[in-house]
Amino acid sequence: MTDVEGMKTSREEERKMARILAIYTKEMISSTVPKVNLIVGKAFGTAGVIMNSKSIGADFVLAWPQASIGMMDPEQAVRIMYAREIEENDDQIALINEKTVEYAQMQNSAESAAKRGAIDDIIIPDATRKRLIMAYEMLYGKKQRNEDKKHTTI
């Protein structure tokens, strides 16, 4: 299950985390077990990608309708993309709120993630158990061959 806003963005944190995240991602990609992910809240940025996303080989990614999936928090994105417009506007808070809602619907909603192929299906919370069981039943007996490699990238 995924509910992650992202990672701290300081240079010190990036230095600490780069190797750890690379190793974790390598292990996720290399694993041969069935990989099913349910996004219950937020899945932003690199943290959202490495938490068993389609991008690193998840077999199924499901999301609840209220899930927010994208590269960054909608308000942060709006503050970057519309910085000049916000600065020049008399009612900055109203503009930020309006643009944040637009951005969230267009880029970060579960529906937009499904259209992009980032998730396989949107499920209602009451159906979670049933859908997870179905996913694992479909993957029963999954056979995946990982070729032996002489070198890794880590």
Task: Name these PLM-found stretches.
Residues 1-154:
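Ligand-binding clefts of soluble mixed alpha/beta catalytic domains
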